[in-house]
């Protein structure tokens, strides 16, 4: 609180009380860990310095080099669906509006839903290709049909209880690219 004294004509001195409130915007953004095509979203909050939501303000979320403009809702929150390939990304959130400015950084990690290792096979030996399949929540994809493509030929195999599928490899010597398809998220 400040006491403000003023005079307009040197004969009369007036006084008023001036109240100064804290001013500023505070962003919050948490790290996100999700599986490919999972339902999790990148969420932010925008509040004033007293923790009250700031409503209807533009917030910029930059992820993977792309800016997304979101508007804070009645709770001061906004979110962005994460539809990125598996990998690690840095999300930068910024606000510059009527309530000041703030910025935050958060990490977004998208996990694979298929895992397998390169193999080296000697012609006609017993080495085979195995891959593990999981759903978008990280649970094994048990007893499901999955598809492999190698050398332009598609093969359908069923996973076991742990989400593993095996593909027998019987090809001439050479280098091949094998593509596995998860039926849950393509």
Per-region residue spans from a language model:
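Short Pro-Gly-centered beta-turn/loop motif in secreted/extracellular proteins
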Residues: 51-52, 81-88, 139, 168-175
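Short flexible loop/turn segments that cap and initiate beta-strands
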Residues: 47-67, 134-154
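Surface-exposed loops/turns
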Residues: 36-38, 55, 74, 85-86, ...
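Glycine-centered loop-to-beta-strand initiation motif
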Residues: 1, 72-80, 159-167
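Proline-enriched interdomain boundary motifs that mark the N-terminal boundary
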Residues: 23-31, 111-120
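Enriched for extracellular/lumenal, surface-exposed ectodomains of secreted and cell-surface proteins
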Residues: 1-16, 63, 85-106, 150, ...
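Beta-strand-rich structural segments
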Residues: 4, 35-51, 93, 121-137
């Amino acid at each position: 609180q400040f006491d403000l004294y003023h005079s307009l004509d040197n004969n009369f001195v007036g006084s008023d009380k001036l109240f100064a409130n804290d001013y500023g915007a505070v962003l919050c953004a948490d790290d996100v860990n999700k599986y490919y095509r999972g339902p999790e979203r990148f969420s932010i909050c925008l509040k004033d310095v007293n923790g009250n939501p700031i409503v209807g303000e533009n917030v910029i979320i930059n992820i993977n080099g792309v800016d997304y403009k979101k508007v804070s809702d009645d709770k001061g929150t906004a979110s962005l669906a994460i539809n990125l390939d598996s990998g690690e990304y840095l999300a930068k959130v910024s606000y510059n509006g009527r309530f000041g400015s703030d910025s935050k950084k958060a990490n977004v990690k998208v996990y694979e839903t298929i895992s397998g290792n390169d193999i080296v096979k000697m012609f006609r030996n017993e080495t085979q290709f195995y891959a593990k399949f999981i759903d978008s929540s990280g649970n094994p994809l048990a007893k499901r049909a999955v598809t492999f493509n190698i050398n332009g030929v598609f093969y359908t195999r069923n996973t076991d209880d742990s989400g593993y599928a095996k593909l027998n490899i019987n090809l001439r010597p050479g280098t091949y690219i094998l593509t596995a398809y998860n039926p849950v998220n393509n």
